[in-house]
Amino acid sequence: MGIVINLFLLVPASIVFFAAGFFLGRFFLERLGTTKVLEAEERAVQIVQEAQKEANEYKDLKVTEVNQEWKKKRREFDQEVVIKNNKFNQMQKQVQQREGQLKKQAQDNRDMERRLQDQRKENEQVQESVTLRAAELERIISEQNERLESISGLQSEDARQMLIDNMISKAREEATETIHQIHEEAEQEAERLAEKTLLTAIQRITFEQATENALSVVHIQTDELKGRIIGREGRNIKAFENATGVDIIVDDTPEVVILSCFDPLRRELAKLTLQKLLSEGVIHPVAIEKAYEDASKEIADVIMSAGEDALSSLQLPDMPAEVVKTVGKMKFHTVYGQNLLQHSREVAMLAGVMATELKLDARLAKRAGLLHDIGLVLPATDEPHAISGRNFLKRFNESGVVLNAIAAHHGEVEKESPIAELVDAANVISLSRPGARGAMTADGNVKRLESLEEIAKGFPGVIKTYALQAGREIRVIVEGDNVSDSQADVLAHDIAHKIESEAQYPGQIKVSIVREKRSVAYAK
């Protein structure tokens, strides 16, 4: 019973303690929550302050960077303005110079017209003077005839003297006729012997093809290669033509690509380049340039080999290497449509055979015949090619007979030996072959194309010039570092104007300026 009473007493006490603990716990929890809130608010304020500070620092940094970038752009703009002003001033100077040249040319034209008028007046005065002089002479002759008619009666002594004079005059006429007949017979005999010698020389020599073609044919294995040669949108053909200066023709002819150019050396270089590209199987602009560089190195061996073969065929050893190389260059030049080396070999063989028939030195005749046109492959000078060829061979102690034959074969100097006459005759025979005179037109066209290229080469900044499309286009390669886009436009106009003033041509000529700038860097 006592235990039950104690339990009833403990239950209310437990409830009281539980309630007290509950309220105490709630009180402490509320106090703790208030503390956490205060701490959180303080932390939030601190974070906001730090963020504001960082934002201000970031803002100051960006303002500094923007100011620096603006100053940099300003400096670049100022520099660009200076460069543009310099270019403008330069172009303005060029325009002023051009205006000065045009004014000077106009003044020269006026002076020339004035001189022509003065010359015309002077010619009229001379003609009038000649007319008066002729009338005076006619009057004097008429008076003399009247005087002779009035003196009809001559004395016996005068008549005898007149008879003697007539007999002497008749004897002189008969003697002159006899001498003239002897001369004609001697000339006929000399012509007969000369014809026999020439016929013997011509019959002993087999002439090769006379006309040099302006086309080269490159055979390919399959027509599928034509698409690779053309390239995407024709870029490979453009790169090939820019590198070689040769037109490449890809048509429906099976397994054939045609190269067209008036310059045989360029055409041979282009042929070697294309053959290298086809053998390697890789065709793109960079590969084209590399193949062209390799072909340019190999062409020197081809030239030397051509010179050595020419000397060997004529049995002419012992020539300096420089002379042999120059002879080899003849393979890539033409004269009146004929390959120059072939023409020189023909002249050498003809001169050698005629020298043998006439018991002269055949070796000297062949040597002079082979070298007579060597001046055509030397750098251009103001001298005729016969004189420049003689001066070139003088440096190698060439025989005086050979030097005279070379210099005299176009009449620039007097012929001093029979060898010189033989070389001149052999040259005329070779150039008189069937088709030679018709080839003169082609040779004139070649010279016209060369003159167009030389006109364009005379301008600053020009690297290479090519006459394409039979002279209807002049493609000019310029230095990208020295010629700007605006200057390229001016250059094209100047070249076209100079061609108009200095060259004669049918139709119109397109002047194309090709400007390329390459930048190379290496990653290490």
From Swiss-Prot:
Could you tell me the Gene Ontology terms of the biological process aspect for this record?
mRNA catabolic process
The keyword Glycoprotein is annotated on this UniProt entry: no
EC identifiers of the protein: 3.1.-.-
Q: Which PROSITE patterns does the record associate with it?
A: HD (PS51831), KH_TYPE_1 (PS50084)
Spell out the Pfam families in the cross-references. Answer: HD, KH_1, RNase_Y_N
Domain (HD) spans 340-432
Q: How does it sit in the membrane?
A: Single-pass membrane protein
Where's it mainly located? membrane
Q: Where is this region: Disordered?
A: 96-127
Instruction: List membrane-spanning regions.
Output: 3-23
Key words, A-Z: Cell membrane, Endonuclease, Hydrolase, Membrane, Nuclease, RNA-binding, Transmembrane, Transmembrane helix
Occurrences of domain KH (ranges) = 214-280
GO (cellular component) term, any one: plasma membrane
GO MF term list: RNA binding; RNA endonuclease activity
Comp. bias regions, Basic and acidic residues: 100-124
Give the subcellular location. Answer: Cell membrane
Q: Does the keyword RNA-binding apply?
A: yes
CDD domains from the entry?
Answer: HDc, KH-I_RNaseY
Family to which this protein belongs: Belongs to the RNase Y family.
Role, per record: Endoribonuclease that initiates mRNA decay.
Q: What is this protein called?
A: Ribonuclease Y
Q: Which organism is it from?
A: Chlorobium phaeovibrioides (strain DSM 265 / 1930) (Prosthecochloris vibrioformis (strain DSM 265))
Q: Top-down, what is the taxonomic lineage of the species of origin?
A: Bacteria, Pseudomonadati, Chlorobiota, Chlorobiia, Chlorobiales
Q: Which gene encodes it?
A: rny
